[in-house]
Amino acid sequence: VQGFTFSNVTVNAFIIGFNHNNTREGGNRIHFLIGKISGKDVALCDSKYNNTGTDAGFRMNKSNSNAGGWNGSYMRKDVLGNSGSPANPPVNSLMAALPADLRNNMKSTTKYTDNTGNGQNNASSVTATTDYLFFLAEFEVFGSRSYANSAEQNYQKQYDYFKAGNSRIAYNHTN
């Protein structure tokens, strides 16, 4: 995936919601996280983690900027693979690395996030994207916001999984 090779790694997906926020995100959806390794919540990371640069890697953008917001991000389009579809995922994307039987059952979800970026923090910056793979928003995890666009929470709901007290921490999958 974007220059990182996963070898002999089994990452389990697990369900965090059924029909979550279905009036905005679409009905008959099962929301899941990727993933857990040996029961521990993990985040997929590579050597580019917490570094800026222009080469391929697990980073939000290839520049030190959030211009274009989530919609225009390198992470959304190239790393996760939302510029394609489960039937035709972009080469070297996480979507392409998923098992075909999982991809064959994926449905798109509408997510509302700041798709302008640059710290404008206004309601007009919050628009919809249609994604198969996505990052959870701050409000969806914590039920409150400190850093995200203040208007995002008007379109989002906290996942019951996190409301129930499950860990909000994901560890680097290589540790």
Identify what each model region corresponds to.
Residues 1-175:
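Collagenous Gly-X-Y triple-helix signature in extracellular proteins
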